[in-house]
């Protein structure tokens, strides 16, 4: 069983939900980014998504867009993020997933990128702009390297398309809570529960919810309908505040840990 599968199996056996934390690789710089990843793990994150910065991130909200810009300005790119994953893997046993747009992968070459991602210790890959109709090559290659290709589905995804996406998935299903870009929100739309229920009827894979999750009450609202929640912008905002307000590093790491622990307590 893969590391991702093991985490969700353990969570299910204890009646708990997985807390998946997102961070942009190289934000605000590579050295501190590694410290952030280790802090997320120590605070209780069950799985960590590491974003690969890209200049045209269509699915990212303003907070994560700015994180990508900071990472790019600090010299982070595919090579650096793969090295970051490798450094994190030397110290951590939890699953690490790369979230990347398709373009950087194509620039390196699909097979080469997947080979190096697996060699660095990644467990899976999320490609937000990969259409299911064009994903066969990547899906087959990823499986050959032991990498899960984790798809995104939304409330607006049609039923036939949803069935096709879910049928080809591995790792877990990433359900998007809203149509649009990432970012913390005050509330979640009612159709989120319908989406989660629908997806769970179609697959035995874990079903997780992201986009807009950042408050304990949101997790309490939806946790009975999913296997995990994904928190991104609410954590990245803390890093942005560090940069803008010149906070002490230790204080930032403390705030990140507290946020994870607070969300973990209700998951």
From Swiss-Prot:
GO terms for cellular component: cytosol. InterPro entries: Aldolase_TIM, RibuloseP-bd_barrel, Trp_synthase_alpha_AS, Trp_synthase_suA. Transmembrane segments: none annotated. The active site is at residues 49, 60. GO terms for molecular function: tryptophan synthase activity. Keywords: Amino-acid biosynthesis, Aromatic amino acid biosynthesis, Lyase, Tryptophan biosynthesis. CDD domains: Tryptophan_synthase_alpha. The keyword Electron transport does not apply. It comes from the Bacteria. It catalyses: (1S,2R)-1-C-(indol-3-yl)glycerol 3-phosphate + L-serine = D-glyceraldehyde 3-phosphate + L-tryptophan + H2O. PROSITE patterns: TRP_SYNTHASE_ALPHA. Pathway: Amino-acid biosynthesis; L-tryptophan biosynthesis; L-tryptophan from chorismate: step 5/5. Its EC number is 4.2.1.20. It is an enzyme of class 4 (lyase). Belongs to the TrpA family. Tetramer of two alpha and two beta chains. The alpha subunit is responsible for the aldol cleavage of indoleglycerol phosphate to indole and glyceraldehyde 3-phosphate. This is Tryptophan synthase alpha chain. It comes from Carboxydothermus hydrogenoformans (strain ATCC BAA-161 / DSM 6008 / Z-2901). The gene is trpA.
């Amino acid at each position: 069983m893969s590391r991702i599968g093991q985490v969700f199996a353990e969570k299910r056996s204890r009646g708990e939900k997985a807390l998946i934390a997102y961070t942009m690789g190289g934000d605000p710089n590579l050295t501190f980014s590694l410290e952030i990843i280790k802090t997320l793990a120590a605070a209780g994150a069950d799985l960590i998504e590491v974003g690969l910065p890209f200049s045209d991130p269509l699915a990212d909200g303003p907070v994560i867009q700015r994180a990508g810009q900071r990472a790019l300005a600090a010299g982070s790119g595919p090579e650096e993020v793969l090295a970051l994953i490798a450094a994190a893997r030397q110290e951590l046993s939890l699953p690490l997933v790369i979230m990347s747009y398709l373009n950087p992968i194509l620039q390196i070459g699909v097979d080469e990128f997947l080979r190096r991602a697996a060699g660095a210790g990644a467990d899976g890959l999320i490609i937000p702009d990969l259409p299911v109709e064009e994903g066969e090559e990547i899906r087959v290659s990823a499986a050959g390297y032991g990498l899960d290709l984790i798809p995104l589905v939304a409330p607006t995804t049609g039923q036939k398309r949803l069935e096709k996406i879910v049928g080809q998935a591995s790792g877990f299903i990433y359900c998007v809570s809203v149509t649009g870009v990432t970012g913390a929100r005050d509330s979640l739309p009612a159709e989120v529960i319908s989406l989660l229920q629908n997806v769970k009827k179609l697959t035995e894979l874990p079903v997780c919810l992201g986009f807009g999750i950042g408050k304990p009450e949101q997790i309490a609202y939806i946790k009975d309908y999913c296997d995990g929640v994904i928190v991104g912008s609410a954590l990245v905002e803390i890093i942005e505040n560090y940069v803008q307000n010149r906070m002490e590093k230790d204080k930032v790491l403390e705030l990140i840990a507290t946020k994870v622990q607070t969300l973990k307590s209700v998951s």
